[in-house]
Each structure stands twice: as structure tokens, then as C-alpha cells.
């Protein structure tokens, strides 16, 4: 079976073609970084308009890359949520229209399920059950995964997501959009322990996260110190260390509570080198294993949507024409396969 995947939940237009026997046949991605750079963040209306311009040309490019056409497809998968409602509507409208015109099923995919399953695109894939840390600009959550669609949310952010805190703190440091990766790069030049920020909610039981207070602490420190480059780097280092320590502590707690020794990290922040190193050390100490997608599949992409859509397609879980986009969509409400 072969499926087209469409991702348009935020500021990346991702298109992919996936074959359940041959694997990923095509992957096309357009980032809107230049569109939003002058505004310091994503402008929803501009994001939607750019998806309108880019989606169909990228689909044509994917067909050319894969050496196939619509007649070779068995379904079309699209991101139905969560995300920016206007951006979601673009991908949903195009995906459902193409599926209807080509007389093949449409499959509505949960964006975070796409991230959660992204490591399945690699050679070394995790077996069920595993613990998943989903950490991105819009979400931070810990999920126990017993199988596809069998998700138990163990904890999630009660305010800002980790990626959002990265981006907002980067903006306070005067870094250009997208700030998260730039803050991580700046942190490499920072001096350890010059500044020390709190590790939010680690002194309380449970697996929920909170990063707004950490962002506030960074804001106060920035305001009260000189704005020379070394000071900025030291603050970036302290901030990143605090976020990573918090995530690692929560992962260790989740693994200990469940007795599971397989950990998946996915989402944009999972590309952070220091986070990967820390979690690899943790899993080595626990005689377990950590899994994550290649860097290009950490951020939003069509490949993860195509893969997740294929699993739903094979299970006969299709989207009806009245299927709505869901800007808010709990991952633990999904149907099990």
C-alpha cells in the first residue's frame, strides 16, 4: 500500500509518499522561516496563505521524486490537528479534495501521534510498550505507549511548552526567529554555573511540567545584567541546562514508575544535542535504550504524517467528509489499532 502525507499544522509545509513495503519514497519540505522572521514568531494568517501557495507544487515534486502518480496511491493522510486552525484547514481541504477526486480514502492524522511514531521511520525502531517524551514548541507531554492509539498521558505542561519557552527566552536575548536552535547554539559558548535557574516542578510528585516560571527567571536575569555577548551566552547555557535537567528528571521518574526501559523522544526540541546526550547517559545507566528520529524528522514534516496515516489506513480508519479540523485534540482520545 502507498499513501501521500500532508503536514500543514503550523509553519512548515511537509509532503511525503510512504510505501508499507519499500518505506519512504519521497519527502518534500518547505519552511516558512523567512516569512515570519520579521515578526519574531509565526503569524497565523501568513502561515495559512503560504500553505496555499506551496502545498500543490510540493505534492507534484513528491510524485516526481517517487516516480509515481495519483493512480499509484491507496490513500491520502493529512494533519487534522492539533495546530493553527487556518493552517490545518489548508492541508485538510487539499487532502480531502484530492482523496475524493482520486476516489481513495482520506485519513485524518493527529499531529502529535505523527511525532510519536516518527522514530518508526528509522532502522532501529522501539518495541511496545515504551515511554514517549513529546517536546515541541506547542506541546510537552509524557506518554505511556502500549501500542498505536493506546496512549496514556502521564504528564504534560500546565503552561508554556518547553519549545515555546526556548523561543521566548531567545527573543529576550535578542536572537532572531526561530530562537530555540539559536539559543542552543549560543549556550555552547556559555560558562557553566555562572547563573542557576530553577528546575520547575521537580520537587513535587507527578509528571507534569511548567516552564513559564523558568522563562520569568531568565527574563529577570537578563534585565538585571549586562547585555554583552558572554553574559547572554552564560544565561542561555543556564536556561538550557535547567530545561534539560527538568526533562531528564521527569523521564527518569516516568521510567521508574512504569518499569519500562524504552524511551522515545520526539518533536522539535528532541533535536537538541545536549538533551539527547543526557538521555542516552540515563538509559545506559538503566540498561535501557533511547530512540529518536533523525534530525530532519524532529521538526514538522510530511513523512511522519504519511507513516502514521498508513497505520490508520491499514486498520480501515478513514476520515469521513464531515471530519473537522481539531486545533485542540487530546492524544489519548484516539482510537486504538
From Swiss-Prot:
Instruction: State where Fe cation binds.
Output: 111, 115, 300
Tell me its EC number(s), please.
2.3.1.234
What's any GO biological process attached to this entry? tRNA threonylcarbamoyladenosine modification
Q: Which UniProt keywords apply?
A: Acyltransferase, Cytoplasm, Iron, Metal-binding, Transferase, tRNA processing
Molecular function GO labels = iron ion binding; N(6)-L-threonylcarbamoyladenine synthase activity
Q: Where is the signal peptide?
A: none
**Biological role stated in the UniProt entry:** Required for the formation of a threonylcarbamoyl group on adenosine at position 37 (t(6)A37) in tRNAs that read codons beginning with adenine. Is involved in the transfer of the threonylcarbamoyl moiety of threonylcarbamoyl-AMP (TC-AMP) to the N6 group of A37, together with TsaE and TsaB. TsaD likely plays a direct catalytic role in this reaction.
Similarity-based family: Belongs to the KAE1 / TsaD family.
Record protein name field: tRNA N6-adenosine threonylcarbamoyltransferase
The organism of origin for this protein? Pseudoalteromonas translucida (strain TAC 125)
Gene this chain is encoded by: tsaD
Amino acid at each position: 500500500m502507498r499513501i501521500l502525507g500532508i503536514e500543514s499544522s503550523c509553519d512548515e509545509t511537509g509532503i511525503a509518499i510512504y510505501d508499507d513495503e519499500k518505506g519512504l519514497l519521497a519527502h518534500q519540505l518547505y519552511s516558512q522561516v523567512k516569512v515570519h522572521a520579521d515578526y519574531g514568531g509565526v503569524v497565523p494568517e501568513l502561515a495559512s496563505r503560504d500553505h496555499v501557495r506551496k502545498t500543490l507544487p510540493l505534492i507534484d515534486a513528491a510524485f516526481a521524486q517517487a516516480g509515481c502518480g495519483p493512480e499509484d496511491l491507496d490513500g491520502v493522510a493529512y494533519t487534522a490537528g492539533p495546530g493553527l486552525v487556518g493552517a490545518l484547514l489548508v492541508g485538510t481541504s487539499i487532502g480531502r479534495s484530492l482523496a475524493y477526486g482520486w476516489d481513495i480514502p482520506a485519513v485524518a492524522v493527529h499531529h502529535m501521534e505523527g511525532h510519536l511514531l516518527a522514530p518508526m521511520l528509522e532502522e532501529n525502531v522501539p518495541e511496545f510498550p515504551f515511554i514517549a517524551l513529546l517536546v515541541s514548541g506547542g506541546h510537552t507531554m509524557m506518554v505511556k505507549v502500549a501500542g498505536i492509539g493506546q496512549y496514556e498521558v502521564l504528564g504534560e505542561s500546565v503552561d508554556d511548552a518547553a519549545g515555546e519557552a526556548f523561543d521566548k527566552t531567545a527573543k529576550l536575548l535578542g536572537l532572531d526567529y526561530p530562537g530555540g536552535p539559536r539559543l542552543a547554539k549560543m549556550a555552547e559558548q556559555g560558562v557553566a554555573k555562572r547563573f542557576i535557574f530553577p528546575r520547575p516542578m521537580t520537587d513535587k510528585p507527578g509528571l507534569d511540567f511548567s516552564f513559564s516560571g523558568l522563562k520569568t527567571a531568565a527574563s529577570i536575569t537578563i534585565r538585571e545584567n549586562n547585555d554583552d555577548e558572554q553574559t547572554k551566552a552564560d544565561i542561555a547555557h543556564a536556561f538550557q541546562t535547567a530545561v534539560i535537567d527538568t526533562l531528564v528528571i521527569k523521564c527518569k521518574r516516568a521510567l521508574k514508575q512504569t518499569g519500562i526501559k524504552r524511551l522515545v523522544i520526539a518533536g522539535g526540541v528532541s533535536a537538541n544535542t545536549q538533551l539527547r546526550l543526557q538521555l542516552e547517559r540515563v538509559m545506559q545507566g538503566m540498561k535501557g535504550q533511547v530512540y529518536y528520529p533523525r534530525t530532519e524528522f524532529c521538526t514538522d514534516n510530511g513523512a511522519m504524517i504519511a507513516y502514521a496515516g498508513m497505520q490508520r489506513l491499514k486498520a480501515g480508519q478513514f476520515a469521513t467528509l464531515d471530519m473537522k479540523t481539531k486545533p485542540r485534540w487530546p492524544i489519548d482520545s484516539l482510537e486504538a489499532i
